[in-house]
Amino acid sequence: TRPARMLIDHEVITEPALSDIEIMEFQDAGRLEAFNTDGLRSLLSTMNHIPNLKEKTLRFPGHAALMLDYRNQGLFDESNIEKTSKKLFQEWKLDENEIEFTVLDIIIKGEMKIITYHLYDEFDLSSRTSSMARTTGYTATASINLILDNLFNSRGVFPPEIVGANINCMEFILEYLRQRNVIISEKTH
């Protein structure tokens, strides 16, 4: 588990992965813990005009402590990772009709208001598609359709935030997801 990079006051800082654990309550997902992980990647350079950016992973309470324990036991060391991975994949395998979910909150704190974008998606029984496949896979196929429909015709490799900065591209992707019942809500407080 690599260290978590984030922007604090326009500076890239590093914190240990699985640190800064907090409990969050969701109406649809229940009680989850959030902890630092290294998910910002390209956002650290493409969005460095934003003073503070932090990404946390959500899991059921106790997950971070378990992973820290595994790390401290050396189970994620190069010599043990294959055995550990095999064990974890077996333990985490879902039953055939077990409902899993994906939840994502993007919280934007301004001087005058806070805007939260919320996504909650579950396993689709009719198509037998996991929520993670739906939320990431449909976004990828929407991006391919952007190119096929000539809505995005720049050449090269672009991180998602550059594509999404084009309002037409962003609206196309959100509508593509909506048509597949992947809904992102917006709340201002």
Can you annotate each of these PLM segments?
Residues T1-H189:
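C-terminal catalytic/substrate-binding lobe primarily of soluble NAD(P)-dependent oxidoreductases
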